[in-house]
Amino acid sequence: NYLEAYSLEKIEKSEYYTNPQCEHYGICGGCSLQDLNYNEQLNQKNVQVKDLFYRIGKFSSIPINNIIGCEQHYGYRNKMEFSYSSNKWILDLNEKDQEIDNTAFGLHVKSRFDKIVDVNDCHINGKLSNKIFQFLKQNLYKYNIIPFDIKKRTGFLRNVIIRQGHATNQILINFIITESDNSCLIPIAKSLVSEFDEIKSVLSSTVKRNSGSSFSDEEKILWGEDYITEKIDENIYKISSNSFFQTNSKQAKVLYDLIIEIAGFKGDEIVYDLYCGTGSIGLHIAKHVKMVYGIEIVMSAVIDAI
């Protein structure tokens, strides 16, 4: 009694259709609902949650409330991971017979692991982070940084992670590379710091060439600290490159306040915050309960929480 289907042709626009802001929408895998008006986006997310609980989880008696929308629909993300690749997605088929630059700095093509859309701008990314992204886009080639070829498993720079504290305006940049020697990144790191006063941390993290993840235990500081801070309510959180933190800082406060409201804490409770990351949920509710225990496997996140 369950089927999945894929769109073959668009005959008529839905009543919920809206023009997506992003010129890459539909090809880029970074977003999936930009062509729906926001209320319908929330409705479709509600449908997905119900499907997870009712059809997959078999929790048929659990009531599912409506999704709480965010005031800021664009520019809300505090973390983006961009790929630097020699496998550019060619939009114009006429280019195939021309000598073209296959280097791309952007996001994966939808449903493709091996092709990167060379994006010009990312509308869900914060404004400051976008400026840094565009600076990198203009300068990576200038500084002779070799892009990664995901098919051949060759090249130096795989990804660039940009994290931004929306309340503090602090920036962390992490270059995900395939070799331990990061000396070729020093000039571009200096250039970044000179251009953007908000940058507090520039790092490099080495991952194996055949790894499908950007997570690394070998992290080196190119400039500054190894973390930034973010403020939610009166709490200031320390965030390192590998630590999990809610990617929408403003909506995180809405979520955390809702947890307190629904839980109805009396002040004598002991709370276990499982998979706590930097401990942002536990620390937010700490003053409302007797004790909070955070449980987390990523050591850098544990250090951040402490």
Regions inferred by a protein language model and the residue ranges of each:
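Short, aliphatic-rich beta-strand segments
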Residues: I162, N169-T178, I236-S240
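Residue-level signal for inorganic ion chemistry
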Residues: C31, V160, V202
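Internal alpha/beta scaffold segment
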Residues: D114-F156, E179-S204
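Extended interfacial segments that mediate partner engagement and assembly in macromolecular machines
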Residues: E9-Y16, G26-I146
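N-terminal cysteine/histidine-rich coordination modules
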Residues: E4-Y6
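Rossmann-like S-adenosyl-L-methionine
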Residues: S180-I306
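Flexible glycine-rich surface loops and low-complexity tracts that mediate binding to linear polymers
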Residues: N1
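Short edge beta-strands and adjacent turn/loop segments
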Residues: T154-A167
